[in-house]
Amino acid sequence: MHLRNIVIALAATAVASPVDLQDRQLTGGDELRDGPCKPITFIFARASTEPGLLGISTGPAVCNRLKLARSGDVACQGVGPRYTADLPSNALPEGTSQAAIAEAQGLFEQAVSKCPDTQIVAGGYSQGTAVMNGAIKRLSADVQDKIKGVVLFGYTRNAQERGQIANFPKDKVKVYCAVGDLVCLGTLIVAPPHFSYLSDTGDASDFLLSQLG
């Protein structure tokens, strides 16, 4: 599929997303950079075209659930602004830009250096899953060890990475790929199931909480 056709297909389905924008909560998501250290740090990369740092769907949903379960203990940090969540970057060799990967890698390293006692959990949605894969596999073993769990919604590198993150323990990762979500099969064809992951955010949050010490 040519890049122009990829962009048109992704843009059309983004507009046609069945999730009502009025029901979504847009949060700041810059709490690692701007706030005090917390016992838990959640780092998330949003889907293509989503505004803000956490986005307006699965990112805020997981963040809010973690905060409800561990009141006062969670800092939520979205990847940006160098990660722009633009559509064309989906067609790059790693499914996102090198700038986005480097920014996410830097956030993980910042969490460890700034807050050495924090437990890190992470996630991504759509293009954001490629950001997480690219960043986490490049981290040192010491930083990777601080990451307790990762959830990936509509994993765009699922087929290429065989359902896991390269160079990272498989038991720390939970992948959510809906039936009929063709990006999980290694394509850039975005079908309606790709927008179904809000219903998985409760289970994903429970998984991350279960990974904490």
Curated annotation (Swiss-Prot):
GO function term, MF aspect, one: cutinase activity
Catalysed reactions, as listed in the record: cutin + H2O = cutin monomers
Domain of life (superkingdom): Eukaryota
Record site: Transition state stabilizer: S48, Q127
Main location: secreted
Notes on how activity is controlled: Competitively inhibited by the carboxylic acids butyric acid, valeric acid and hexanoic acid. Competitively inhibited by the dicarboxylic acid succinic acid. Competitively inhibited by the alcohols propan-1-ol, butan-1-ol, hexan-1-ol, octan-1-ol, and butane-1,4-diol.
A Pfam family: Cutinase
Noted pH dependence of activity: Optimum pH is 9.0.
Function: Catalyzes the hydrolysis of complex carboxylic polyesters found in the cell wall of plants. Degrades cutin, a macromolecule that forms the structure of the plant cuticle. Recruited by the hydrophobin rolA that undergoes a conformational change after its adsorption to hydrophobic surfaces such as the biodegradable polyester polybutylene succinate-coadipate (PBSA), which results in condensation of cutL1 on the PBSA surface and consequent stimulation of PBSA hydrolysis.
Protein name: Cutinase 1
Originating organism: Aspergillus oryzae (strain ATCC 42149 / RIB 40) (Yellow koji mold)
